[in-house]
């Protein structure tokens, strides 16, 4: 087992009584980090449904690289990766969760077939901290991020996710953070606050696939309305990571079924304690 963050080989106190879940969260606007929104409340509530994890492995839409990278920092920085149009209060947010260099090294070994490498330049982007600050406000759960390799098709992302699945047996929470429906031009140009019909239609199609037909999800670009509902591959692909980290026999629990113009906030969990 991995040692405490930054201490190679040291024993980590194990708190595991249950296999950690695999989650997908629709993270939406960075403002969810500092506002009392239905989605933020949903993230806080879902964290109460299972034991606090020993660590989190996060795949965020906001870290795209050539090659698979794994954060190795003992103390990852809080990255404010959004424009200056947001309020200063958002730039003031710090989420000082520790990293876990030992877990990072183990992940690189586990993902050898995919050419994974350690990276000490990245930190925690807003696809990560805007969500987990509601789940674990004390910032006391170590986090390691795994990047999205821009060179790989969806089927290979699914294979990478499958390689991460057994981490859950060590009470390590696997999270994909993106959005099933993510079309920012459609959000900004919407004539009203009501979501377009295709937002719910496409979201419901993918929800059905998450529950019953993973092939439909992995082949998401071939589904009706994909070109308008899911034009941003990096926001959809984290769905595939939660999907691939599922264990046989697990059924999804859906929450945060909120729709906005061009955006769905749907989230789901596999493996919640019964």
Task: Give, region by region, the residue ranges found by the protein language model.
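Short, basic/glycine-rich phosphate-binding loops at helix/coil junctions
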Residues: 23-24, 82-88, 136-144, 216-218
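Internal, conserved structured core segments that host functional sites
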Residues: 104-156
């Amino acid at each position: 087992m991995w040692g405490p963050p930054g201490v190679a080989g040291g024993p980590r106190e194990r708190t595991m009584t249950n296999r950690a879940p695999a989650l997908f969260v629709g993270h939406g606007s960075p403002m969810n980090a500092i506002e009392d929104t239905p989605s933020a409340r949903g993230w806080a509530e879902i964290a109460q449904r299972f034991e606090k994890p020993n660590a989190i492995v996060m795949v965020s839409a906001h870290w795209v690289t050539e090659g698979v990278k794994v954060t190795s920092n003992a103390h990852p920085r809080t990255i404010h990766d959004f424009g200056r149009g947001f309020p200063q209060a958002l730039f003031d947010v710090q989420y000082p969760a520790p990293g876990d260099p030992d877990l990072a090294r183990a992940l690189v070994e586990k993902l050898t077939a995919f050419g994974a490498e350690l990276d000490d330049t990245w930190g925690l982007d807003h696809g990560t901290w805007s969500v987990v600050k509601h789940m674990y406000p004390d910032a006391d759960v170590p986090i390691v991020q795994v990047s999205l390799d821009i060179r790989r098709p969806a089927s290979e992302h699914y294979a990478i996710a499958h390689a991460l699945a057994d981490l859950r047996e060590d009470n390590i929470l696997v999270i994909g953070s993106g959005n099933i429906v993510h079309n920012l031009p459609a959000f900004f140009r919407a004539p009203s606050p009501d979501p377009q019909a295709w937002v719910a239609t496409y979201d419901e199609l993918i929800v059905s696939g998450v529950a019953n037909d993973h092939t439909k999800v992995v082949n998401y670009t071939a589904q009706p309305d994909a070109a308008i509902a899911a034009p941003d591959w990096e926001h959809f692909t984290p769905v595939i990571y939660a999907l691939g980290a599922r264990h046989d026999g697990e059924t999804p629990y859906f929450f945060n079924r909120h729709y906005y113009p061009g955006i769905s906030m749907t989230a789901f969990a596999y493996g919640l304690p019964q």
